[in-house]
């Protein structure tokens, strides 16, 4: 007579032998339904004889799974559930090594459940993670790890399993779902603050000699490709590679545009736009349409009404105030360095305004020669809204010269400086080649 345990083992054995993703996934999920979950939790611990029908590499998966079910349904312990599920996913990684990509969906589901259990544990018991991190910092031997690091190691194992699959047929390869593992792994590394590890993962991806799926491929891979592109763009942003960062985010936006209902991806879109909009302004002097501002009023207020407006009008006081006001948001989104560099656009607009005023007052042929003192006064008014002769300038002439030298060297102004005469000599043809806003 068959027992519930033997029936379950037979079901596992059949699903593995038939390479049935859906059935095997249902055999190792922590949520098979409350009744089935309770039944599995009360199975006796299987011995070697019980497990004999199951392919050898999958036996530890079943053993760790049944241990996990007891932690979930009997002990009701979120801590034990996390560690047991982490053990099961590691066993599944080992078992999946020799399988084709039929194993991807069960593995993806197991990893998704592991991440969810970690998130619940972290939300309900934040002191546990804080204590682990504290113990990790105080451990002189450095041989322990936090739950988040354990999670990272496990997902990294799944990523390597996918990346190193040597099957040349992509349709049968575990690489087909690589963006799920890549997107989640790089996100975890960011949470850990280990950006070098995130870079090493990206380097490994670029270094593979095997074909990879298209970023805008079908199915759920799109979602994780967007996650990967977003965090990869942040890495480029931190390296001050603004062009590459923009390209990655544009690709992410192209993928999101394929969704039938934009409302389903509005949050993702806004998260990308908060970085993409200043990149487009800095790289190409592009500003978004009114339609974008209407869809994202928070971005409109922060950018169009404040930071971008200050840049477009050369208003240094408004720019500095907005930079201070939104400092935390900019730091959180890796944008603070970019906006510090965008201050040069503010200077540029101010210099052009000054030159325009001088030209209107002096129509002589030498109006392209601008004294530094004129620009110094413009900087003072833009910074403090006023100037009295008794006041000290916010920018001395050396600082003004330095600002102009940077604008010239970066190609934003055509001309040269005369230190002896304390003036800038502008090109008569096109002194401000990069100031066209579109």
Curated annotation (Swiss-Prot):
Any one Gene Ontology molecular-function term assigned to this protein's record: double-stranded DNA binding
One Pfam entry name: PCI
InterPro entries noted in UniProt: Csn12-like, PCI_dom, WH-like_DNA-bd_sf
Ranges for domain PCI: 226-431
Family, per entry: Belongs to the CSN12 family.
PANTHER family: PCI DOMAIN-CONTAINING PROTEIN 2, UNCHARACTERIZED PROTEASOME COMPONENT REGION PCI-CONTAINING
UniProt name for this protein: Protein CSN12 homolog
UniProt gene name: CSN12
């Amino acid at each position: 007579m068959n027992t519930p345990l033997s029936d379950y083992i037979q079901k596992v054995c059949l699903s593995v032998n038939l390479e049935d993703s859906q059935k095997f996934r249902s055999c190792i999920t922590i949520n098979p339904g409350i009744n089935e979950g309770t039944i599995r939790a009360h199975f006796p611990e299987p011995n070697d004889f019980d497990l004999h029908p199951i392919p050898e590499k999958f036996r530890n998966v079943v053993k760790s799974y049944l241990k996990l079910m007891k932690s979930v349904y009997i002990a009701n312990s979120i801590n034990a559930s996390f560690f047991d599920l982490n053990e099961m996913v590691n066993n599944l990684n080992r078992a999946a090594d020799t399988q084709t990509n039929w194993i991807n969906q069960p593995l993806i589901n197991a990893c998704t459940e592991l991440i969810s259990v970690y998130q619940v544990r972290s939300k309900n018991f934040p002191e546990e993670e804080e204590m682990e991190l504290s113990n990790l910092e105080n451990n002189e031997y450095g041989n322990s790890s936090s739950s988040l690091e354990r999670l990272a190691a496990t997902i990294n194992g799944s990523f390597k399993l996918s990346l190193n699959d040597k099957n040349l047929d992509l349709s049968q390869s575990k690489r087909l779902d690589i963006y799920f593992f890549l997107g989640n792994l790089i996100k975890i590394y960011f949470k850990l603050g280990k950006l070098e590890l995130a870079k090493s993962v990206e380097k490994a991806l670029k270094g593979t000699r095997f074909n990879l799926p298209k970023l805008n491929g079908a199915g759920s891979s799109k979602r994780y490709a967007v996650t990967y592109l977003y965090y990869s763009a942040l890495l480029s942003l931190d390296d001050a590679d603004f062009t590459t960062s923009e390209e990655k985010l544009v690709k992410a936006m192209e993928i999101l545009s394929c969704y039938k209902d934009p409302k389903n991806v509005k949050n993702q879109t806004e998260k990308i736009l908060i970085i993409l909009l200043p990149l487009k302004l800095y790289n190409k002097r592009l500003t978004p349409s009114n339609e974008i501002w209407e869809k994202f009023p928070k971005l409109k207020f922060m950018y169009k009404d404040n930071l971008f407006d200050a840049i477009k009008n050369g208003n240094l006081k408004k720019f500095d105030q907005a930079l201070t006001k939104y400092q935390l948001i900019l730091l959180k989104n890796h944008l603070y360095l970019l906006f510090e560099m965008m201050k040069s656009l503010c200077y540029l607009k101010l210099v052009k305004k000054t030159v325009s005023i001088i030209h209107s007052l002096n129509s002589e042929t030498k109006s392209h020669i601008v004294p530094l003192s004129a620009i110094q006064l413009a900087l003072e008014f833009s910074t403090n809204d006023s100037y009295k002769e008794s006041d000290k300038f916010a920018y001395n002439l050396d600082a003004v010269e330095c600002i102009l030298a940077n604008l010239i060297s970066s190609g934003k102004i055509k001309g040269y400086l005369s230190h002896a005469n304390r003036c800038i000599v502008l090109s008569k043809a096109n002194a401000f080649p990069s100031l066209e806003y579109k």
